[in-house]
Amino acid sequence: MSNTNGSAITEFILLGLTDCPELQSLLFVLFLVVYLVTLLGNLGMIMLMRLDSRLHTPMYFFLTNLAFVDLCYTSNATPQMSTNIVSEKTISFAGCFTQCYIFIALLLTEFYMLAAMAYDRYVAIYDPLRYSVKTSRRVCICLATFPYVYGFSDGLFQAILTFRLTFCRSSVINHFYCADPPLIKLSCSDTYVKEHAMFISAGFNLSSSLTIVLVSYAFILAAILRIKSAEGRHKAFSTCGSHMMAVTLFYGTLFCMYIRPPTDKTVEESKIIAVFYTFVSPVLNPLIYSLRNKDVKQALKNVLR
């Protein structure tokens, strides 16, 4: 881990989203507001579901975990990003490792938390008579624990592979947080193992979690089409509508980043897309789930009385 003159790299420089002073001031205010709204929204959702006993169900148990992951996700990047805008743009080697590790871990955790939520909706609509058995407290705890254990295990493995590389080309990271791809570009050692491990992990986790979601919704759609009454179909659709919107928002931004041909993927475009799944998704999820959910809206009214 040394630079071109042989001295050890003890810190990195994060270039951020822009080097324009006027835009930096605007971005600081914008992301500070977004972060505060994210904190308020996700903490509010967690507290609401803890306080109202009617929301002590498997669906809201998973939603509480999703809100917690989103809260940690945006908190991992925003404070450092805001600090870099108003002061020095540096981050220590250990700080960069920690941020990279937590980012990967929480990204993977969210993949499988959304998959667990899709399974919950599948059981509720496709097999309602066995819902209490298939989503017992023990099952729910296992389904919610797996994303954290797997996400933080694979995240640690990926982060260790990255920071075992030798960094000698530069200490400047063209991003607003310590991300794997720009870090790999700074390495002057062989990145074959790391690049392939990253590709395999990204491909497997994205495809496997999305497959669980799509298969679950295929069964849900089949069950809904068998419902004869229009009111029953509408109720079933509304039950999983919020989750479908959250999945579309989260996976949609990731596909925009990785599905395009490599020639079209500029660094600046990648940073802008990263803003969406780092900041936009966490701030919108509480709104999506509260505005389309009668139980949440009623619980909020009860608390505000």
UniProtKB/Swiss-Prot annotation:
One of its GO terms (molecular function) is olfactory receptor activity. It holds the Pfam family 7tm_4. Glycans are attached at N5. The gene is OR5M11. It is found in: Cell membrane. The lineage of its organism: Eukaryota, Metazoa, Chordata, Craniata, Vertebrata. The keyword Glycoprotein applies. PANTHER family: OLFACTORY RECEPTOR. One of its GO terms (cellular component) is plasma membrane. The chain crosses the membrane at residues 26-46, 55-75, 99-119, 139-159, 196-216, 237-257, 271-291. This is Olfactory receptor 5M11. Residues 1-25, 76-98, 160-195, 258-270 are extracellular. Keywords: Cell membrane, Disulfide bond, G-protein coupled receptor, Glycoprotein, Membrane, Olfaction, Receptor, Sensory transduction, Transducer, Transmembrane, Transmembrane helix. Odorant receptor. Disulfide bonds join C96-C188. Belongs to the G-protein coupled receptor 1 family. It is a multi-pass membrane protein. InterPro entries: GPCR_Rhodpsn, GPCR_Rhodpsn_7TM, Olfact_rcpt. Gene3D superfamilies: Rhodopsin 7-helix transmembrane proteins. Residues 47-54, 120-138, 217-236, 292-305 are cytoplasmic.
